[in-house]
Amino acid sequence: QTSEVGMCGRYSIYESMDDYLRQLALDLVVINGYDHERINRYNVAPSTRVEVIRPAPGGLNVDRVKWGWSPFWAKGKRVDPINARAETVMTGKFFKSLWPNGRALAPANGWFEWIPDVADPKRKQPYYIQAADGRSLFFAALAEVHPGLEPDERSGFVIVTAAADEGLVDIHDRKPLVLTPELAREWIDPGITTERLAEIVQTGCRHSTDFQWFPVSKQVGNVRNQGPELIKPV
C-alpha cells in the first residue's frame, strides 16, 4: 500500500552492523550472533523486524525486533505505536515497563519525512534526512525483547522522538532523538543515572545543523520498494 507517514515513519539502515558498532566504539563484545553482511534496507516500515543494539549482562546484544510496541494491557486496542514522545516517555503509564531498563539504540543512515507540496498542498513530497557528514545515526529507542527461534509477539521497540520546535524540514514536525556516538554510548550504559538520562532525553538530540535533506521519489511511500534509488535526490 502507499501511505504518507509522519515522523519518523520510515528510515534506512543499509551498512553492516559491524560499521555501526565500529562508530559506537564501545569496549563491549556482542554476546549473541548477528549477521555481518550489509543490511541494505532503504525503507524500513513499521511492524517489520529490524536490528537494534541493547545492553546485556557482559556486553551487548544485537536483535532483530519488530518496530512498534504496546504494553500487554493495550495489545490489540490500536496499532502498536512506533514512537515515544520525549516529553512523556519518562513519566507516562504507556511506556512504564520499558523506562528506563528497556533502553536500546536503533542504528540508521537517515529517515524520511513527508512535507506538503508547495504546488499542490493536498499532496505531500517525501524528503530524506541524513547526517551532513555522511556518518551513521543512532536513534534513542526503547525495546522489549524475548529471544527465541520464533519472533515473540510481546517483543517490539519504539524510537524516542524530540520536541516539535526542533523539527528539521518541517518546523511543525517531530524528529527522532538522534544521539552522537558519545551520547549513544551513555544511553546504553547500565550505570547511567536517571537524572543523566532525563538530560539526554531533553537536550541530547543532535542539532538541525548536523543534517542535510533533499526531496526523493514518492516510491518510498510503497513499503514494497526497498532499493538505494529511494534515497537519491530528485
Q: Which residues fall in each region the model found?
A:
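Short linear sequence motif anchored by a di-proline
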Residues: 1-234
